[in-house]
Amino acid sequence: MASTSTLLLPSLSSKNLHIAVPIRTNSFVRRTTKFSTKCSSNPESKDQFINLTPAPESINTTSAEKFPIEKRRRSEIIRDRTQRGIEKPEPPNFEIGWKRTKEINLEKPKGYVIMDFLEKFEALMAREFGSKELLAKAGEIVAERAREEAEVLRDEGKVEERMVTELFRVLKLMEMDLAMVKASVKDETLSQRIEQARARCRQAILVANSF
């Protein structure tokens, strides 16, 4: 056996034998995924962001003092606190029943004091009175007071002389009718004289109203 192995060695060495030994290699392949974003050149997307973003010059350019905010005055605030009652608002149409469209003259006439005396005395004659003498005396006092007031208005130049003279004439006629009331005996005559005196008193009221 040893001789045969020694014989084979030179023969093997003399021949060029190429023996391919398979080599087992473990190769690991790494798979990588690449993500790519494609930028489009569409101008509409840019315009959307431009519209949403405010301009730099429009930010913080108006001061707090110049900002257009209407401020309420202090007097108006106080006035709102006091008005807590229920008030009827003004109607849209002013030509309605409870609101007058014609202006009412509230100025009193010049002879309103004389008118007041005579109106009260005329109402007194329409009632039941104590006696005829007291009614005639009250008429004399009222007529004298009306004359004094008319003379004051005449001296101040507010009433003309002819109006004062007319008032004095009517008052004198009223005093004459009251004297007839005091002298009357029958009830029929008494009622007639009283009605005549009341008519003279109403006439004196109209004269005083025309001052």
Curated annotation (Swiss-Prot):
Required for both formation and activity of the chloroplast NAD(P)H dehydrogenase (NDH) complex of the photosynthetic electron transport chain. Functions in assembly or stabilization of the NDH complex; probably involved, together with NdhO and NdhH, in the formation of an NDH subcomplex A assembly intermediate (NAI500). The keyword Chloroplast applies. The lineage of its organism: Eukaryota, Viridiplantae, Streptophyta, Embryophyta, Tracheophyta. Biogenesis factor component of the plastidial NDH subcomplex A. Disruption phenotype: Specifically defective in the accumulation of subcomplex A, a stroma-protruding arm of the chloroplast NADH dehydrogenase-like complex (NDH). Residues 1-38 form a transit peptide. Keywords: Chloroplast, Coiled coil, Plastid, Transit peptide. This is Protein CHLORORESPIRATORY REDUCTION 41, chloroplastic. It is found in: Plastid, Chloroplast; Plastid, Chloroplast stroma. The keyword Electron transport does not apply.
